[in-house]
């Protein structure tokens, strides 16, 4: 019979498999569209008639275009070919209303060549804002000299409180697509996602759908945005075009809807931008692989979390465990969380880091045998006593830290002084957190040496939570994949590869010091005792 723990793990794995299969089925339903099988109720593509088309892009400050007044033509592509990819950069005049925190819209028309858009009954058009509102990025300065790379003219005129208010930012890219497949839709089962982009006309006895025009909003990244100052009169706009297949179009529509839903649920523009980066900066096939990798990452995260908590919850002794390594992991995890918070990193990275910091704080409480007593609103901390075996482990631990400090502290202090002299920061707090985190990332693996030293002196690794380590080892290699996909600070990205080395060293020690099955573990049990224990007969 399965134990309760095994049954729970099997249940989690089973739910995970069902989730992956269901997601694959949903994705198949998105990219595959059943064509019309008969002549009745079929909707034919207008592009199959090979019409001569023209692409026109206008700008205006009005969200609803009633007439051809007060609009500016910024791009006109005559003899527009749906199959031909292009990219053009134009200068757009910025009206006074837009410079005063107003909005500027782009109207994209696809119409018959030689006919004005508003005189063409078979034209299709879409509207897209060319501006968005965001709080300007804080200016970075040299903390010693006060110098900055760029001085914001408008910032000098505004009070400090006004710098935290959202201002208009320019979107320098406008990515356009037209569905180029001559696909015949079944009118009785039109996909809802594509239907809202379709415009139908009656030609004789046949219903046709006009060219499906699509604006790729996922290509608008926060890193490309430009602040619009009151002195700005012209700004560059790069208009790009490429054809798109029906399957990719439907997938892209769903992804845009998902990003929009995140913003409706309270995600900031920057958080949503991190999700955009996964789709825009990644090949579609690699993206599919990433989905499966992410699913396994989620599974291993849960299993590692479950086994790690279970291990530390039952642990009563610190024999063979480096207390200094536990303290360091707690300090480094908290510093990394504060650094990611200061860098305004995506919630996709920030939330797991925060949960990890809370768990490490709890581990410190267990490692120090700490008891918290409340005297009114003031807490008092009492530390437990160590046994003779634990004091021996602590002695090895202190010895390792003594040698390590000779190398580590000068490197960290030197790095902090160098960054203060040569790198610009938003504030002294930002410099302090960056100095700490650079020390953690650059030399953090050195703090794993005390645990490795304790393992060496005891000639044993049986006291380590190997099941949790195994799941974490899988995840650290998965993190290597995500390091190239999700936007994050470079130092955090490099730390993912550093963890690979740490786990390889642990695996080497596990091979070097095989577990003695007669040895009593930290729970007072040995493998041979459990094997010889008679089952209950009642």
Swiss-Prot record:
Record's keyword terms, sorted: Apoptosis, Endoplasmic reticulum, Glycoprotein, Lipid transport, Membrane, Transmembrane, Transmembrane helix, Transport
Glycosylated residues (UniProt): 91, 101
Pfam families xrefs: CLPTM1 (PF05602)
Topological domains, Cytoplasmic: 1-10, 306-324, 365-402, 450-538
Gene Ontology CC: endoplasmic reticulum membrane
Sequence ranges on the Extracellular membrane side: 32-284, 343-346, 424-428
Location in or out of the cell: Endoplasmic reticulum membrane
Gene Ontology biological process terms from the UniProt entry: apoptotic process
Broad class of where this protein is predominantly found: endoplasmic reticulum
Transmembrane segment boundaries: 11-31, 285-305, 325-342, 347-364, 403-423, 429-449
Top-level taxonomic group: Eukaryota
Keyword set includes Endoplasmic reticulum: yes
Keyword Transmembrane recorded: yes
UniProt membrane topology term: Multi-pass membrane protein
Single GO MF annotation: phospholipid scramblase activity
Catalytic activity: a 6-(alpha-D-glucosaminyl)-1-(1,2-diacyl-sn-glycero-3-phospho)-1D-myo-inositol(in) = a 6-(alpha-D-glucosaminyl)-1-(1,2-diacyl-sn-glycero-3-phospho)-1D-myo-inositol(out); 6-(alpha-D-glucosaminyl)-(1-octadecanoyl,2-(9Z)-octadecenoyl-sn-glycero-3-phospho)-1D-myo-inositol(in) = 6-(alpha-D-glucosaminyl)-(1-octadecanoyl,2-(9Z)-octadecenoyl-sn-glycero-3-phospho)-1D-myo-inositol(out); a 1,2-diacyl-sn-glycero-3-phospho-(1D-myo-inositol)(in) = a 1,2-diacyl-sn-glycero-3-phospho-(1D-myo-inositol)(out); a 1,2-diacyl-sn-glycero-3-phosphocholine(in) = a 1,2-diacyl-sn-glycero-3-phosphocholine(out)
Disulfide bonds: none
Role description: Scramblase that mediates the translocation of glucosaminylphosphatidylinositol (alpha-D-GlcN-(1-6)-(1,2-diacyl-sn-glycero-3-phospho)-1D-myo-inositol, GlcN-PI) across the endoplasmic reticulum (ER) membrane, from the cytosolic leaflet to the luminal leaflet of the ER membrane, where it participates in the biosynthesis of glycosylphosphatidylinositol (GPI). GPI is a lipid glycoconjugate involved in post-translational modification of proteins.
Family per record: Belongs to the CLPTM1 family.
Protein name: Lipid scramblase CLPTM1L
Organism: Pongo abelii (Sumatran orangutan)
Organism phylogeny: Eukaryota, Metazoa, Chordata, Craniata, Vertebrata
